[in-house]
């Protein structure tokens, strides 16, 4: 029997994947030796994200000569949600507003967002102390659900002071789930902060992202299973932390600025930079983050992406919808004199 010192123990490896707007990057990292075992880059197939992920994983395992059983974790950061908001490419969703008057509905970015997303307003809502102001009236909901059933892929619900008392949001959610199997987002699940218009925007954007992130997660899980990888799947949030794929499946809005967060956290760690800027020029967007005292600076009022102010905790990033994959053309009618479009290869 060999001595303990001569027994070669399998080393745990971590797979990192970034599904960007242009390329999907992946690598195998060994925490024990602090080395990158292998890395690959493949074009992102927007119609079938799973094919890009599958190709990247295959190259990683074969070229890196790593067994699937030695993989301890699969971590994913993605610019998918960020790019979808910048490009206005989220899936259609409907908003149900409870107890919100005209003054509230006309604030912030909500009116613009509702131009292309149907909504219905119900009587109800609570006071700032959580007391019911008006009984919930769901009578307009059934006809509304029938009207939008074929035109949307999800629903968002926001209620007046639902962070103080979520009962009306919960009741409406149950009714929607009884009528349809589409995903439902409650604003009170995304933030405990006041500001109903901002919560409404965050919830509606989340509902628009659910189908996109679902397709991504299904692609990753399908590929890992095909290669025999049983390691947990973790997703990076916009604040640089990792959460489970189940968490992200219902709260994809938490992944906005996930890609830039990964760049900022990585740059801070690798450069030992105390104060500075991190500029990440991708294929679709260019992102600028700030490092102060060795750490990425957080956005105090919530992440802002594509002109939308959200209640998502994230690093402070300035995102422009221009990258190496962008095509710039003269446009006399535009305010800037130019127009941007994307060329996906």
Where do the language-model regions lie?
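N-terminally biased helix-coil "hinge/interface" segments that flank
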Residues: 2-343
């Amino acid at each position: 029997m060999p001595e303990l010192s001569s027994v070669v123990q399998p080393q745990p490896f971590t797979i990192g994947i970034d599904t960007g707007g242009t390329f999907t990057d992946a690598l195998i990292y060994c925490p024990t030796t602090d080395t990158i075992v292998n890395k690959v880059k493949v074009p992102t197939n927007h119609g079938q994200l799973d094919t890009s992920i599958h190709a990247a994983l295959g190259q990683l395992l074969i070229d890196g000569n790593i067994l699937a059983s030695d993989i301890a974790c699969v971590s994913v950061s993605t610019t998918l949600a960020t790019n979808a908001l910048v490009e206005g490419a989220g899936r259609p969703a409907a908003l149900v507003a409870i107890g919100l008057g005209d003054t509230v509905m006309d604030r912030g970015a909500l009116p613009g967002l509702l131009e292309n997303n149907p909504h219905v307003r119900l009587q109800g809502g609570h006071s700032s102390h959580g007391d019911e102001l008006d009984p919930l009236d769901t009578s307009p909901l059934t006809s509304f659900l029938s009207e939008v059933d074929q035109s949307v892929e999800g629903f968002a619900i926001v209620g007046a002071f639902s962070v103080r008392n979520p009962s009306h949001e919960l009741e409406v959610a149950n009714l929607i789930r009884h009528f349809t199997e589409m995903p439902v987002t409650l604003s009170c699940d995304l933030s405990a902060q006041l500001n109903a218009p901002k919560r409404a925007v965050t919830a509606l954007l989340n509902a628009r992202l659910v189908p996109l992130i679902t397709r991504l997660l299904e692609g990753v899980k399908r590929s890992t299973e095909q290669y025999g990888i049983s390691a947990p799947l973790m997703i990076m949030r916009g604040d640089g932390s990792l959460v489970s794929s189940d968490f992200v499946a219902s709260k994809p809005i938490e992944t906005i600025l996930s890609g830039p967060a990964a760049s900022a956290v990585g740059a801070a760690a690798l450069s030992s930079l105390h104060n500075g800027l991190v500029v990440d020029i991708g294929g679709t967007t260019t992102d600028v983050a700030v490092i102060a005292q060795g750490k990425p600076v957080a956005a105090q009022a919530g992440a802002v992406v594509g002109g939308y102010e959200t209640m998502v905790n994230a690093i402070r990033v300035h995102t422009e919808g221009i990258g190496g994959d962008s095509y710039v053309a003269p446009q006399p009618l535009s305010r800037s004199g130019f127009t941007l479009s994307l060329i996906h290869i």
